[in-house]
From Swiss-Prot:
One of its GO terms (biological process) is response to hydroperoxide. It holds the Pfam family H2O2_YaaD. One of its GO terms (cellular component) is cytosol. This is UPF0246 protein Bpro_3713. InterPro entries: YaaA (IPR005583). Signal peptide: none annotated. PANTHER family: PEROXIDE STRESS RESISTANCE PROTEIN YAAA, PEROXIDE STRESS RESPONSE PROTEIN YAAA. It comes from Polaromonas sp. (strain JS666 / ATCC BAA-500). HAMAP family: UPF0246. NCBIfam families: PRK02101.1-3. Belongs to the UPF0246 family.
Amino acid sequence: MLFLLSPAKSLDYDTPPHVSTYTKPLFTRQSAELIDVLQTKTPQQISTLMKLSDALSGLNVARYQAWSPKFTAKNSKQAVLAFNGDVYGGLDAKTLSEQQLGWAQEHVCILSGLYGVLRPLDWMQPYRLEMGTALATGQGKNLYQFWGSQIADYLNQRAAAHTSPVIVNLASEEYFKAVDRKALKARVVSCVFEEFRAGKYKIISFMAKRARGLMVRYATEHKLLTVRKLEGFDAEGYRFDPAASQADRLVFRRRQAA
């Protein structure tokens, strides 16, 4: 069983990693191609393309210029420890043991506009490149056309090696769209997290993001290998709702945050 996550805009390269184990990203040739395109852009062009402030566009232009095909402990950090948004607050990878991170390495994939797919312990240099960015390359007008079926092909390869070839989609729509569903062979199961507000259950974005990270942590701590086991997820007050769920759409609800 493979768990898919989106990356985060917020990054933490200040906190030293608590583990030294790392792997190299798999799609560095493609990343270098994208960096070559990004390095031709001015801060104003990046600001317009990505809808960023002048300060953020300047920061990311500097990141593109500094990016190197050689990944080192000085310019990189393990992806799951570098990302720092709502999802990663729920996952809280800095408190996972090296053994638990090793399990996550085999069962978690982080989708990325620049890196395609990152494993948790893959070294990552800082960047900002949302998957929905309309960055024109030799492969087309946006990143979906750039990546094509490459991400799905890789996920097929990974899923086929598992006893349960299932992909648990915990990524956003923007990122999961980069997985070519026609090319993807594995069964896909999605998880939905809802809060009780004003008399009904609804998805609240930042809470749902945190819950996705909590789900991956739960799976990692319990070494879950089947969809049925996911139904036991109960972190921070969530409970599986069988009546609201379908075979490939698991709904978790809570009346109030625990």
